């Protein structure tokens, strides 16, 4: 992470990125690669960025950053500047992907696979109703990403 921080100071600040909290996902091994998987609803501002780019980053903040989590999980980057609002300090990798100085751990990832969750594929209809019935929003899109780089404090 420190290498990325030093590099960021030499580079132009990128002006278009977003951050959000994501509770649904995991890390594992697939297709002989270290992977992560995340689920994002199409209504989210972050979804636009995921669709436009081949890479994404996952940053893990500690408990001391609860206020940052609260803002990033409740407000949209369409309406506020989350970096300004939270005090997050963006740093950029050599590939130009954004990480945050406050993160204890960050994963730089390349998209491998993406597909929408489909109602007809649910084997457990209770989960379908619980998470997608009523006013919950659209069906998530699942992204499987290869973990290319790991940065830690």
Please identify what each model-predicted range represents.
Residues 111-153:
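Flexible glycine-rich active-site/ligand-binding loops centered on an Asp-His dyad
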Residues 93-103, 131-136:
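Exposed beta-sheet edge/beta-hairpin loop segments within beta-rich domains
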Residues 79-82, 97, 104, 113-114:
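Conserved, well-structured core segments that form or line functional sites
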Residues 82-91:
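Short, structured beta-strand/loop micro-motifs enriched in basic residues and often containing a Trp
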Residues 1-9, 13:
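Single conserved hydrophobic/aromatic residue that forms the stacking wall/gate
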Residues 15-23, 107-109, 145:
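Short beta-strand/strand-turn micro-motif
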Residues 20-73, 82:
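A short mixed-secondary-structure module that forms the rim of ligand-binding clefts
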């Amino acid at each position: 992470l420190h290498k990325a921080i030093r590099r960021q100071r030499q580079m132009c600040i990128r002006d278009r990125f977003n951050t959000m909290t994501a509770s649904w996902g995991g890390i594992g091994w697939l297709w002989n690669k270290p992977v992560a998987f995340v689920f994002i609803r199409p209504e989210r501002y972050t979804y636009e960025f995921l669709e436009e780019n081949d890479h994404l980053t996952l940053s893990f903040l500690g408990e001391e950053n609860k206020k940052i989590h609260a803002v990033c999980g409740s407000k949209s980057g369409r309406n506020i500047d989350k970096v300004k609002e939270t005090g997050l300090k963006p740093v950029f990798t050599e590939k130009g992907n954004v990480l945050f100085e406050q993160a204890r751990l960050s994963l730089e990832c390349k998209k491998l696979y993406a597909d929408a969750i489909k109602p007809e594929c649910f084997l457990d209809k209770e989960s379908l109703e619980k998470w997608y019935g009523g006013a919950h929003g659209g069906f998530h899109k699942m992204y499987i990403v290869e973990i290319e780089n790991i940065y830690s404090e």
